[in-house]
Amino acid sequence: MLPTQAGAAAALGRGSALGGSLNRTPTGRPGGGGGTRGANGGRVPGNGAGLGPGRLEREAAAAAATTPAPTAGALYSGSEGDSESGEEEELGAERRGLKRSLSEMEIGMVVGGPEASAAATGGYGPVSGAVSGAKPGKKTRGRVKIKMEFIDNKLRRYTTFSKRKTGIMKKAYELSTLTGTQVLLLVASETGHVYTFATRKLQPMITSETGKALIQTCLNSPDSPPRSDPTTDQRMSATGFEETDLTYQVSESDSSGETKDTLKPAFTVTNLPGTTSTIQTAPSTSTTMQVSSGPSFPITNYLAPVSASVSPSAVSSANGTVLKSTGSGPVSSGGLMQLPTSFTLMPGGAVAQQVPVQAIQVHQAPQQASPSRDSSTDLTQTSSSGTVTLPATIMTSSVPTTVGGHMMYPSPHAVMYAPTSGLGDGSLTVLNAFSQAPSTMQVSHSQVQEPGGVPQVFLTASSGTVQIPVSAVQLHQMAVIGQQAGSSSNLTELQVVNLDTAHSTKSE
């Protein structure tokens, strides 16, 4: 045997005896007892004897073939990163003993001399590359920081969208599940598909017809050029102002498992400071509502009872002044809240419209905790001259907090209005005032003869002027929650009808 072959045999015998190699064949296993002495002295047969002279010579020849040029490039790469040979070389190196330690290689150098050490080093070239962290057969680059810019390659862009959309949906689910928060996520692809994730309270934003119409209106609108408004740019930035001016009150009913209809998110209209006394007139049968055409939301004015012990605080926002207030005291029938005419519900902000005040006033008797008093609701119409430009009072609340509160659902072409205590059965009324020309909206009263009936108010419009959805849901009569048996509160039922239909809506 040549010295080179003897050194290689000794190294192989040592590695096999320590159990770090995959070359433990059935023929080599009987000689395992003398493996240690065979490796140290090179004379006593160990596992190396079990390999047979033919196999050993082939291994030594393969090791000697790679000896002449053990350069740094061969040590680190060995082949192209994408080639198949790189993987084969790496697997072959693992079969020849990937778990050998540095001390074992030093033993091989001592036994076989410089030539054996060179042969061993050359034979395990890819192993050194694996230790350095640059595996030749690795297909992915791992974590690489990419530039935050639009991807021009269409295939790469589609792939990135698919992966990251799935990831952000998963993150939204994890956020809502781990922390119990309400999450609404909407992703619209460039192919026209809309993907959404919403928790229980926010599902009506994407399942109701009004919510779908609002989403489609926003997505179908032309993309406006970048504006000089700094707030818009900051909100589109990852490090911008994430918090909005919208707030909602969290109460015990969030964890009591109420129905989804009761916990619908909504805009709750609360107290407005600076409201002057309105001129009350006798109930009439019509009211004129003039709305100038423009790219803003419709304006609906009405009066509602509010708490007398409210001290609101003003908060400024990009879409106009928003006053947030909370009411927790008993409802007073003497206090009137007037929603002004110049509030606009539109993303991005819009110029508020000036509309003469025409309002629907709701008188409501005090609803105390006393079980012996019944409260009733009657509907009258008031009107005041001039133009009101007071700021809007809007407060988001997912749970009704006061009995006299009212809720509004904004939409691109309508404002949905309903008392909070009437939302238990999913009732909703659409007050639609969006038109291209001044129009007239009729409010007619109907008397109910049978006892226990619900007074009704019909909002009708002439054909072609005011578009009122026929599928509007009526407000039904229901008892106010929290009062004892024998005491109930009748709510006024508002029915929205359209003169275009052949038949009028039936009263419940």
Swiss-Prot record:
Q: This chain belongs to which protein, by name?
A: Serum response factor
Compositional bias ranges of the Acidic residues kind: 81-91
Q: Quick one: which gene encodes this?
A: SRF
**CDD domains associated with the record:** MADS_SRF_like
**GO molecular function terms listed in the Swiss-Prot or TrEMBL record:** chromatin DNA binding; DNA-binding transcription activator activity, RNA polymerase II-specific; DNA-binding transcription factor activity; DNA-binding transcription factor activity, RNA polymerase II-specific; DNA-binding transcription factor binding; histone deacetylase binding; primary miRNA binding; protein homodimerization activity
Q: Which PROSITE patterns match?
A: MADS_BOX_1, MADS_BOX_2
Please spell out the taxonomic lineage of the organism that makes this protein.
Answer: Eukaryota, Metazoa, Chordata, Craniata, Vertebrata
Q: Can the keyword ATP-binding be found in this entry's annotation?
A: no
Kindly list every residue the record annotates as glycosylated: S277, S307, S309, S316, S383
Q: At which residues is the DNA-binding region annotated? A: 133-222
Question: Under the cellular component aspect of Gene Ontology, which terms does the record hold?
Answer: chromatin; cytoplasm; nucleoplasm; nucleus
Provenance organism: Homo sapiens (Human)
